[in-house]
C-alpha cells in the first residue's frame, strides 16, 4: 500500500482483464491396484496444469504480462480408486484484448492435445469477466494536474500496472 494522502495515476491500460476458466478432464474410473485398466484424470489434469504454465513462459511475449492460475483442483473421493473425472478451475488475466483471446485459444488447444494423447476427453468453459481497465490519457492528465494542484506534486506519483481486475473497467 501507499501512505495516506498519496495518489497515483497511470494513463492507458492499468489493470488486467479477468476470465474464469473451468476444465473437466474425463477419464475412465478404475481400482488403484489396476491403473492399467483406467484412464487417470488426476494424472492428466496434473499434466494440463503444468503445460498451461508454458503458455506464459514460452508462447507469449515476455513484455506482455499474462497470468494463468489454477486455483481449484478436485479429483476423486476415495484413496484407492481412480476417479472418472477431475475438475480444475482458475483465472486468466491479460493486459490486451488480442492476447486475452489468443490465450484462451491456446489453453483449449493445450487441454485438447494432452487429453487426446491420453485417450481422455475434456470440457472447457470460459466465464468472461472484466475487460482490461484502460485509463484515457486525456482524462488521466486532467485528473493528475488537479491532484497536483490540491495535494502538491510531492503527493502525486506515477502509478503502476496491476494484474488485478476491476469492474470500473466498464
Regions found by a protein language model. Give the residues of each.
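Active-site glycine- and acidic-residue-rich loops that bind
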Residues: 36, 96-101, 105, 161-163, ...
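A conserved active-site cap/scaffold subdomain adjacent to cofactor or substrate pockets
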Residues: 79-105
Amino acid at each position: 500500500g501507499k501512505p495516506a494522502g498519496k495518489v497515483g495515476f497511470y494513463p492507458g491500460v492499468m489493470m488486467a482483464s479477468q476470465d474464469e476458466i473451468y476444465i473437466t478432464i474425463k477419464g475412465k474410473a478404475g481400482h488403484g491396484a489396476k491403473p492399467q485398466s483406467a484412464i487417470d484424470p488426476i494424472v492428466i489434469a496434473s499434466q494440463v496444469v503444468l503445460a498451461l504454465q508454458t503458455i506464459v513462459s514460452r508462447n507469449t511475449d515476455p513484455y506482455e504480462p499474462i497470468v494463468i492460475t489454477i486455483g481449484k483442483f478436485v479429483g476423486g473421493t476415495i484413496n484407492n480408486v481412480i476417479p472418472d473425472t477431475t475438475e480444475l478451475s482458475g483465472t486468466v488475466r491479460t493486459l490486451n484484448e488480442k492476447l486475452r483471446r489468443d490465450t484462451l485459444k491456446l489453453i483449449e488447444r493445450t487441454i485438447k492435445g494432452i487429453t487426446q494423447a491420453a485417450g481422455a476427453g475434456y470440457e472447457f468453459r470460459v466465464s468472461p469477466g472484466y475487460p482490461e481497465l484502460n485509463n484515457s490519457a486525456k482524462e488521466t492528465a486532467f485528473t493528475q494536474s488537479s491532484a497536483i494542484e490540491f495535494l502538491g506534486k510531492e503527493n502525486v506519483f506515477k502509478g503502476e500496472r496491476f494484474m488485478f481486475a476491476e469492474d470500473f473497467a466498464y
